[in-house]
Amino acid sequence: MSSEFNRLVIVGGGTAGWLSACLLAARRPELDVTLVEAPDIPTIGVGEGSWPTLRETLATIGIDEARFLSACDASFKQGSRFDGWVDGSADDSYYHPFTPPASAPMADILSAWSAQHGKTASFAGAVTPQIAVCDRDLAPRQRAMPAFTGALNYGYHLDAGKLGALLAEHGTAHLGVKHVCAHVTGVERGEDGLLAKLLLRSGDAVEGDFFIDCTGMAARLIGDELGVGWRDRSDVSFNDRALAMQVPVAPGSAIASQTVGTAHKAGWLWDIGLPTRRGIGCVYSSRFLSDEDAEAILADYITAKLPGADPGALAPRKLQFATGHREQFWRGNCLAVGLSAGFIEPLEASAIVLIELSLKALADAYPHSRSALPRLADRFNALFRYRWDRIVDFLKLHYVLSKRGEPYWQAQRDPATIPDSLAAQLELWRDHPPSAADLPQVDEIFSAFSQQYVLYGMGFPLPSATRPAPGHDALRRLAEVSERSRALAAALPSNRTYLDTLRTAQTDRGAQGAIA
């Protein structure tokens, strides 16, 4: 490789910065990777859910799964459960799990589900055993299984601050990442207009060939220096505020296998279970709900879900955000990753997976020469504009299908707020179920089966392609799911048992190492 782009400089730490440093250092060991971060700028750190992609990312970086689970106070995430999104009734609940539905043509599966259960049983519960496992707070794997493998597909719930610290330690100790704690006060460009060096408050400078902007919503490089514009998406995604709270839990309490998203009159609440606490937050639109009412909704939820907890003794962290993304993510020799690239409500935990996909795309096509920069940037920008459009569509899908009557929910169904691309897909899906042909990218963030779980979980009409009488193969597949559900429910440990046993083993191993 030419030495023209060997010096990679990352500005900003947190999950985005340190994932960038570690993944690029691991995938491109010929690079000289430097991360520059101010020592006194806090990270947002509320995104505590990952997709299954994080397993491959950790393996690539070289972080052991058991070490990650212990160091990051992490637990297993097997999907999301949505309560109250359809009509707000007591039994209004559906799952979007990570494991795909039973392997058979979806039109046949829908026919078998409808015939067998009359649509009284949940769609997800009929087509994947993951729901039986989640309902029982079970882990997706046994301790004896090889790392990063499981009986079911899974990601993680985690402490974002601890993940950043683990990545920083691993990157500097094992991957050769240089860590510079300093305030960036300016940027110098070369004669060709490309970024050339960062100017530090100390008077020093850090030179680079390629730069990654992980400065969060400040967007110091991609926004302030390069002037890349912002595409506002608040016309589609209304929520612009959140209250976040960390609620301690009693030792031995159950740990949920899924993120729980509970709808309220002007937004929704998240609930994420970790071994030592629950991360709970209230997402809302300031157009439809006051901050005081949001705090009351959050307090009422905590009181109802965690008896004995005193929400009045806990101060929520107040967040305001703009929904949207950069018009370009890559300009010249600078790539925006994380919040500097864009932000949308954390309804389906898209933040970390967008970071991972951005870094994968960069590592796969890292520039060797200045002449390649425009073409690589154009290709990257086209791909991630597509990905952002699909994320906006998928999150909007959750609102469009709701039948709730509050003004907020009625506004969400206003056709003027529904992207043309989503409206076209919904029309198509009245004819046939979502398929790979509808979502053509290789690394779709939300695949056809994700669309299916939300559509049929929320009561979308069965498509015209559904057969009037189910075939034998589809019925057999659903019977296999039922049997597999019983088998896994009997064989898998609870999340609490798995994680407590793992932490005890990690503690014992550390003590033995200290003695040795």
Where do the model's predicted regions map?
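Predominantly flavin-linked oxidoreductase catalytic cores and closely associated redox partners
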Residues: M145-A294, L359
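Conserved N-terminal helical subregion
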Residues: S93-G186
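FAD-binding beta-loop-beta segment adjacent to the flavin cofactor pocket
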Residues: K318-A336, G342
